[in-house]
């Protein structure tokens, strides 16, 4: 239970949590906690995501001239929800690989298992972002959510330029308080677990943030209609 409790404690006592991580890296317990909460939030979002997906699938079927009812959007949503822990795992591994490379460049030898634990605990801010997104959608009401863009309320620099789309818009959306807090935690974690100066830890986290942001936005641009 201590490893799960540290998912909350890391927000208030990051140095103490990452000291324990440095002594004994932990992944399965915090990952399981993140995955369970992520799936619960995704299920709670279904009243907002399902109508949008149904409309998009019906529009796609009409554009292709397909007769009959559109595919079952609910089935696709449940499949996507079940797959979320797998996607989360892949993202954690990718992010850890980037942090490991940056740690090796800036601070010497990086310990992948320890860094995976650091990144996993730092990802709690992403889960908080999902919860805030759900809250915003609930306040707006399902009747006011009609497109995929409505499912991604502005929470970052995109608040300053709401009309900006495409690659730049994706970058602005990615620079938000939750992402910054997550990489701040990563910087603290790298510094504590690898006994590096705090400034070096922050530099590693900042470089990793830039790389992951550019990769994420570039992949998002590959989706149909992203431009």
Name each model feature, range by range:
Residues 113-227:
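Hydrophobic alpha-helical transmembrane segments and adjacent short intramembrane/lumenal linkers
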Residues 4-21:
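A short amphipathic helical element positioned immediately N-terminal to and/or at the very start
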Residues 4, 81-90, 132, 171-177:
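Hydrophobic alpha-helical transmembrane segments of multi-pass membrane proteins
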Residues 12, 96-100, 183-185:
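A generic alpha-helix surface/boundary motif
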Residues 16-128:
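Selected alpha-helical membrane-embedding segments in polytopic membrane proteins
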Residues 10, 63-79, 148-168:
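Interfacial loop/helix-cap signal at membrane boundaries in integral membrane proteins
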């Amino acid at each position: 239970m201590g490893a799960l409790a540290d998912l909350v404690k890391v927000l208030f006592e990051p140095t103490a949590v990452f000291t324990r991580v440095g002594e004994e890296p932990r992944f399965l317990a915090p990952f399981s906690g993140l995955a369970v909460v992520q799936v619960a939030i995704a299920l709670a979002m279904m009243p907002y995501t399902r109508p949008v997906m149904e409309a998009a699938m019906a529009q796609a079927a009409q554009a292709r001239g397909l007769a009959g009812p559109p595919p079952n959007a609910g089935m696709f949503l449940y499949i996507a929800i079940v797959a979320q822990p797998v996607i989360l795992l892949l993202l954690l591994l990718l992010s850890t690989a980037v942090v490991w490379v940056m740690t090796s460049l800036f601070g010497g030898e990086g310990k992948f298992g320890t860094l995976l634990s650091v990144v996993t605990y730092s990802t709690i801010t992403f889960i908080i972002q999902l919860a805030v997104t759900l809250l915003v959608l609930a306040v707006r009401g399902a009747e006011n959510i009609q497109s995929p863009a409505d499912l991604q309320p502005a929470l970052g620099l995109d608040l300053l330029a709401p009309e900006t789309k495409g690659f730049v818009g994706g970058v602005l959306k990615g620079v938000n308080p939750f992402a910054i807090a997550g990489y701040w935690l990563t910087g603290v974690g790298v510094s504590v677990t690898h006994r590096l100066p705090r400034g070096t830890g922050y530099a590693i986290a900042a470089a990793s943030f830039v790389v992951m942001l550019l990769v994420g936005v570039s992949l998002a641009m590959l989706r149909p209609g992203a431009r």
